């Protein structure tokens, strides 16, 4: 009988310690950890030509770096507001850790630099290349081909976003025009002419 009382008391003390740790100590220690600060930056963008003939392929080369602390993930997005389908886009080569993702109009996307808080439907075609994780100081590159299907100005949007998105430097650029996700982009363009 005495052993049962001691055992019951020991179990009760262990449960009190466990719940105290899980309800107070662990949450406080996790909240005290400062979020990492990755710094996304696109270091180089080049287009294969300033002018192309209709039906001719345009090659976009993009290089990005994480100049901050390690990122859980960093994405480089290349958007094509003139294209309403992904048929004319392909990745030529890349050294990112994950497989690039083609995004067709109508796909649900996160927006305003949030993971899931805010979302929008894609209005135009784009491609996302990314690495998970993306270590501090690491650089990745990709070459993407797009074939414009109309004459006139063919626009390319480029941006990079690092997660956790814990400060303004986690996205690049920090200002400019907003894309379909209400995120800043750099704009590039070529003139498409009759062949």
Which residues does each PLM region occupy?
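Short solvent-exposed strand-capping/beta-turn motif centered on an Asx-Ser/Thr pair
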Residues: 65-70, 83, 149-151
């Amino acid at each position: 009988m005495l052993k049962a009382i001691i055992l019951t008391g020991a179990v009760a003390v262990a449960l009190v310690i466990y719940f105290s740790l899980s309800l107070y100590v662990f949450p406080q220690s996790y909240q005290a950890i400062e979020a990492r600060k990755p710094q996304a930056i696109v270091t180089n963008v080049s287009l294969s030509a300033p002018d192309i003939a209709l039906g001719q392929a345009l090659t976009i080369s993009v290089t990005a770096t994480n100049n901050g602390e390690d990122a859980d993930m960093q994405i480089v997005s290349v958007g094509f507001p003139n294209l309403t389908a992904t048929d004319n886009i392909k990745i030529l080569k890349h050294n990112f850790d994950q497989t690039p993702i083609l995004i067709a109009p109508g796909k649900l996307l996160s927006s305003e630099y949030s993971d899931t808080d805010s979302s929008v439907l894609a209005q135009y075609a784009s491609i996302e290349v990314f690495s998970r994780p993306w270590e501090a100081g690491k650089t990745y590159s990709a070459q993407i081909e797009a074939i414009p299907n109309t004459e006139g100005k063919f626009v390319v949007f480029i941006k990079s976003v690092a997660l956790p998105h814990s400060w303004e430097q986690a996205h690049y650029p920090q200002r400019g025009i907003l894309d379909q996700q209400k995120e800043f982009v750099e704009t590039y363009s070529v003139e498409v002419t009759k062949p």
